[in-house]
């Protein structure tokens, strides 16, 4: 039952949330390098 609507939650999570976290961490890394 759970597996029916699991992909509809998992796909946006991987497709939107993970790149957002990756860009945010990369942005913070670049900012940290510029300050130092």
Swiss-Prot record:
<dbReference type="InterPro" id="IPR036357">
    <property type="entry name" value="PSI_PsaI_sf"/>
</dbReference>
<dbReference type="GO" id="GO:0009535">
    <property type="term" value="C:chloroplast thylakoid membrane"/>
</dbReference>
<dbReference type="GO" id="GO:0015979">
    <property type="term" value="P:photosynthesis"/>
</dbReference>
<keyword id="KW-1133">Transmembrane helix</keyword>
<keyword id="KW-0150">Chloroplast</keyword>
<keyword id="KW-0602">Photosynthesis</keyword>
<keyword id="KW-0603">Photosystem I</keyword>
<comment type="similarity">
    <text>Belongs to the PsaI family.</text>
</comment>
<keyword id="KW-0793">Thylakoid</keyword>
<protein>
    <recommendedName>
        <fullName>Photosystem I reaction center subunit VIII</fullName>
    </recommendedName>
</protein>
<keyword id="KW-0934">Plastid</keyword>
<feature type="transmembrane region" description="Helical">
    <location>
        <begin position="9"/>
        <end position="29"/>
    </location>
</feature>
<keyword id="KW-0472">Membrane</keyword>
<dbReference type="GO" id="GO:0009522">
    <property type="term" value="C:photosystem I"/>
</dbReference>
<keyword id="KW-0812">Transmembrane</keyword>
<dbReference type="Pfam" id="PF00796">
    <property type="entry name" value="PSI_8"/>
</dbReference>
<dbReference type="InterPro" id="IPR001302">
    <property type="entry name" value="PSI_PsaI"/>
</dbReference>
<comment type="function">
    <text>May help in the organization of the PsaL subunit.</text>
</comment>
């Amino acid at each position: 039952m759970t597996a029916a609507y699991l992909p509809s939650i998992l796909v946006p999570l991987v497709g939107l949330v993970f790149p957002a976290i990756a860009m945010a961490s990369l942005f913070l890394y670049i900012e940290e390098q510029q300050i130092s």
